[in-house]
């Protein structure tokens, strides 16, 4: 096979892959129902397409402090803050039993690259602040100080599809997957760079993963935020781990903006 054909194939792969938020709604692949008792740091980002339309859950996020939510840049890039709501303390997608707050500011990473999904991290500033001190259903999560070791179990939470192009569920889901070596991840995604700002996790046999609608949600290791759901090839496919924003890599960036 000559170099021209290889380049064409690589380009087709690149065009075919997208952020996992491309089709919001649904739940984690291969996971199980959970409640916000175990995931008090998880929030829903709900967005309306226009001032006259209704809000719908489009991405996840996690609480860093009373006014700061971490999510994926592709969830908020080129969007208006006034068209978002954050819902905390509610594990039902579309439910209204939690605390609903408006968004005052969106801060996507200034070097976010939508083509290769690099620096796919953003902060969402809410107003009024979340009542963390008086709430039993929401809490902030600590940021991981360093990238987790290969093989360590990580927990993903979200409302994404149960399978590629699958059906949706109203209940928050969780699944555990191991952290994958970055070099092996790069071999899988040979047509797109796996940068220092990315972290990979998943099973070689597939079956467990984040999916459409989980974007912006947390990947947690030892009760600390290690990753943010970013992108992948399909959902839960063998030999294609999920790719996450590597939160430890961005800790200084986060600190400079909160």
Curated annotation (Swiss-Prot):
Pfam families: Trypsin. Residues 1-22 form the signal peptide. It is found in: Secreted, Extracellular space. GO terms for cellular component: extracellular region. Its main location: secreted. GO terms for molecular function: serine-type endopeptidase activity. Disulfide bonds join 59-75, 185-200, 211-235. It is an enzyme of class 3 (hydrolase). Residues 23-27 form a propeptide. Gene3D superfamilies: Trypsin-like serine proteases. Residues 28-258 form the Peptidase S1 domain. The record marks 209 as: Required for specificity. InterPro entries: Peptidase_S1, Peptidase_S1_PA, Peptidase_S1_PA_chymotrypsin, Peptidase_S1A, Trypsin_dom, TRYPSIN_SER. One of its GO terms (biological process) is proteolysis. Its EC number is 3.4.21.4. The active site is at 74 (charge relay system), 120 (charge relay system), 215 (charge relay system). Keywords: Disulfide bond, Hydrolase, Protease, Secreted, Serine protease, Signal, Zymogen. It catalyses: Preferential cleavage: Arg-|-Xaa, Lys-|-Xaa. Belongs to the peptidase S1 family. This is Trypsin eta. It comes from Drosophila erecta. The gene is etaTry.
